[in-house]
């Protein structure tokens, strides 16, 4: 049987450790090597990690708070399996997760499968944040092809030898390390296969501040990705691009409304009719229709708490633009980025 190594990293996630580890030790595939990395936790996670160190299939690594990418690299260097799987501490893989990915790792003619990625299902709580996140992730999987360009961090498996050959996970990358290694593997001639029946369940993502901070990091990291891997057409895209344009569209619509009000107040009755005709042709169609489109989008795809949803989406759009600006600032200052070769 094929030995599979699974790496999971934790920093200050004491309440999530048992749930994740129990789902890993109960995997239907055997043999399995589970590598649990404590990334400088200060909330009691270190003690919980020590308890799991006694399990026969678990190896523990303790490191300073160096980040997820550094933790995964440490696990990769310690791994012995032919395949190296990764997941997150707030994820609960289904019992056949590893088995399903292994079944899809067999290369077809003229293919070299170097990674397999499964499907992450985000749970929903009663709050708006978790519902929006769940809907957004689900939308990304609706039309995902078999051969994909991203081995997602919560639910993927890599050929360990090929992953080491391309340098593994770069510890200097603060985010999107899964995307970086995916693109490197593809550039090296391999393919990544998506298998929808290899499922992991993500606990509901709640809390506006945490949600927005993650989306800002996403945007910041994507700038770096696009700078280093120019011309790549990503196939795992949800509603983020729609959300990105919410702030510009709202600004445009607000401009249309203010222009309308300003001109109406200045017009007399004689010129009012001609003004309305011009306004309909030039201002309403250009500036106000985006607001109707936005309203339709919210009614069709988002929870019933529309005002709260609009606030969350607008905040999301703002932090995406902030992340993009930070990403370009990184380009200028070479912050958190290895020097280009």
Outline where the language-model segments fall:
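Conserved small/polar residues in nucleotide/adenosyl-binding loops
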Residues: 334-341
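Glycine-rich, basic loop-to-helix element that forms the pyrophosphate-binding segment
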Residues: 63-79
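Catalytic donor/gating beta->alpha subdomain of glycosyltransferases that bind UDP-sugars
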Residues: 172-173, 179-234
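Conserved donor NDP-sugar-binding/catalytic core segment of glycosyltransferases
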Residues: 96-128
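Short aromatic/hydrophobic "clamp" motif used to bind/position activated sugar donors
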Residues: 84
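A conserved acidic beta->alpha catalytic loop
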Residues: 23, 38-47, 91
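Membrane-embedded multi-pass helical conduit in multi-pass membrane proteins
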Residues: 247-332
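Short, acidic, metal-binding catalytic loop of nucleotide-sugar glycosyltransferases
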Residues: 23-31
């Amino acid at each position: 049987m094929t030995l599979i190594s699974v790496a999971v990293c934790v920093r200050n996630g004491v309440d999530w450790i048992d749930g994740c580890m129990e789902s890993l030790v109960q995997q239907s595939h055997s043999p399995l090597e589970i590598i649990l990395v404590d990334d400088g936790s200060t909330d009691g996670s270190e003690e919980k990690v020590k308890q799991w160190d006694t399990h026969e299939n678990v190896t523990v690594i303790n490191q300073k708070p160096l980040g997820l990418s550094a933790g995964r690299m440490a696990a990769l260097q310690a791994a012995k399996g032919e395949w190296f799987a990764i997941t997150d501490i707030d994820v609960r893989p289904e019992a056949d997760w590893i088995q399903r990915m292994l079944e899809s790792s067999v290369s077809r003619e003229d293919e070299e499968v170097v990674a397999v990625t499964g499907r992450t299902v985000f749970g929903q709580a009663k709050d708006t944040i978790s519902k929006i996140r769940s809907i957004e992730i689900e939308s990304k999987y609706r039309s995902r092809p078999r051969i994909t360009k991203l081995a997602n961090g919560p639910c993927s498996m890599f050929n360990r030898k090929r992953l080491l050959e391309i340098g593994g996970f770069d510890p200097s990358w603060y985010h999107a390390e899964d995307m970086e290694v995916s693109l490197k593997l593809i550039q090296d001639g391999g393919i990544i296969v998506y298998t929808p029946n290899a499922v992991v369940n993500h606990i509901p993502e709640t809390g506006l501040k945490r949600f927005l901070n993650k989306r800002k990091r996403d945007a910041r990291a994507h700038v770096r990705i696009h700078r280093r891997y120019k011309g790549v057409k990503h196939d795992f895209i949800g509603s983020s691009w729609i959300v990105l344009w919410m702030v510009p569209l709202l600004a445009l619509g607000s401009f249309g409304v203010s222009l309308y009000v300003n001109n109406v107040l200045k017009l007399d009755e004689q010129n009012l009719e001609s003004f309305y005709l011009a306004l309909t042709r030039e201002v309403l169609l250009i500036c106000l229709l985006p607001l109707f489109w936005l309203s339709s989008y919210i009614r069709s795809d988002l929870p019933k708490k529309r005002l709260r949803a609009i606030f969350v989406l607008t905040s999301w759009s703002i932090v995406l633009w902030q992340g993009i600006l930070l990403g370009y600032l990184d380009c200028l200052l070479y912050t958190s980025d290895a020097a280009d070769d």
